[in-house]
Amino acid sequence: MASHQQNKQELDERARQGETVVPGGTGGKSLEAQQHLAEGRSRGGKTRKEQLGTEGYHEMGRKGGLSTMDKSGEERAQEEAIDIDESKFRTGNNQDKNQNK
């Protein structure tokens, strides 16, 4: 039991020194903060995937993967003639609203 507590304290100390000790916890100033950040980021991604659907989430990932420090994913897709179907980005709520107009 003491080793678990000691390990937790060691991780917390490393986090306080600015090291990321939890995957997805970047920016947290303590072990607990990093755990909360990682959980929120994971949950946010899952929620977004549910909103967009698998195809939309995949298309958005393709576009984001093309981005660089100099150019957005949209600019690179246009330059390299890569087709990104943004109609798949629409959430279920947006589609319902557009149909009612």
UniProtKB/Swiss-Prot annotation:
Residues 90-101 have a biased composition (Polar residues). It holds the Pfam family LEA_5. GO terms for biological process: response to abscisic acid. In seeds, expressed in the embryonic axis and in the cotyledons. Not detected in leaves, stems or roots. Induction: Down-regulated by drought in 30 days after fertilization seeds. Not regulated by drought in leaves, cotyledons, hypocotyls and roots. Residues 1-101 are annotated as: Disordered. Disulfide bonds: none annotated. InterPro entries: LEA_5, Sm_Hydphi_plant_seed_CS, Small_hydrophilic_seed_prot. Transmembrane segments: none annotated. Residues 7-17, 38-62, 71-89 have a biased composition (Basic and acidic residues). It comes from the Eukaryota. PANTHER family: EM-LIKE PROTEIN GEA1 (PTHR34671:SF11). Belongs to the small hydrophilic plant seed protein family. This is Protein SLE3. It comes from Glycine max. The lineage of its organism: Eukaryota, Viridiplantae, Streptophyta, Embryophyta, Tracheophyta.
